[in-house]
Amino acid sequence: MKLFSNEIALQNVISNPIYRVRNLNQLLALILILFSHTLFAQQNPLITVIGDSLVGKMVSGESTREVYGNVVLTQGDVVITCDKAIQFISRNDAELIGNVIVKKDTLTIKTPRGFYYGNLAKTRSNAGVYLDDKKVILTADSGDYFFNEDRAFFESKVKLYDTTTTLTANELTYFQQQNRAVAIGDVVIFDGENQIIADTLEHFRNSKITFANSNVRLTNLKNNSEIYGEHLEDYRERGYSIIDVTPLFIQVDTSYIESEDSLKEMQLDTLFIKSRIMEAYRDSSQRFYAIDSVSILKSEFASKNDLTIFYRQDNKIITAKASETAKQPILWQENSQLTGDSITIYLDDNNIKQLDVDGTSFMLSQNEYNLERYDQTSSSQIKIFFTDGKITRADFYGNVYSIYFMYDGETANGLTKSNSAETTVLFEDNEVTEVKLYKNPASEYYPEQQVTGNEKSYLLPRFVVLQNKPTKEEMYKLLNELR
């Protein structure tokens, strides 16, 4: 009837020469005015509320209905039941009180008390909210649900969980149809083995992809490792993660050492790895990549390189150059320095067991008693063996040149320069005790009186002491900044 009367009014206006519409814009504006009530009613249907009893009231000039007992509110396919409802007729809203249950298709929302806004197709509660859509369960102190958008916004002590993942945050927006959640503030997501902490996080439930930003920390409870950074992408189906803004890897190793009274004392040893990009592959090889500007530090062991690959399953670390023209990786172990095109480190119970150096290798060791004296060896390949973290033997292959300072006890006793196709050097307490030359050996001895004060004259061509060794101070400084 309303629509019919609007059509007559429009015809009268158009046919009357006094009120004839002069242009198309005026005609469109007039149509919008005449039909606005009809369009509004179609987009926002009135809510209906029924129950066991009803009391009509005027509150501050506004018409209300209080409905008691077995209350049912409906709007389209949204159905709400509760103990009591106060309907604000002109506003198309209702206050819902007691055992509130909201349903639409597979979605169920429960709360002790809330509101429903008919014109917005929105429900809200700040009395504790529980949402279940048969895919996830979402709880919080307060929350809104927008039915036209299939979107939930929950605040304060938010918790979302499904069969594999639990997520907590201060705020969370859940897009039901997209199976997507955006969380803000003190965000934690846990899948039983890995935990991600961040200031903000976006999680796609179907694809199991997660993006995290600001104060990010990825913890693997299985191997007791953590990666800090400012941006993380985690692809759980692929078993792949990347942190590409200020990443720092930390792994704490607990070991026990025997003291003089034969009691075992616990000792914590932390592995630090810093780089521009870090990638982790959670497959059978358990690979970890540190890419570009890599720094490694663990007890007396340190390294600088372009690329580090850590095979956790095989207890093996490989460092390498990024290109043929790039700088060689550097490795320090106590008072020794090592360079080569690539360095492979074999671990045993988190301790270095063996080092393999390939391609234009150089090793130097500073003497403990005379810091001006360095034992030096250059070759094409090196294999170094360790016992209890100390060097015991080094095998050099391919055009080997060496300089070793000699000692009688702690008394300096000149040096020996030698070359051969292969060389074996034996160590004790990280000091050279014996040098063995194989295949076309040649050597020269220089007495102490020629050597004293002239140590810098006895250097191999590629000798250089590199001063950019990573330190605990810089690693802990970065860690404190990221925390």
Language-model regions, residue ranges each:
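A cross-taxon signal for low-complexity, glycine/charged-rich
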Residues: 1-7, 11, 22-29, 41
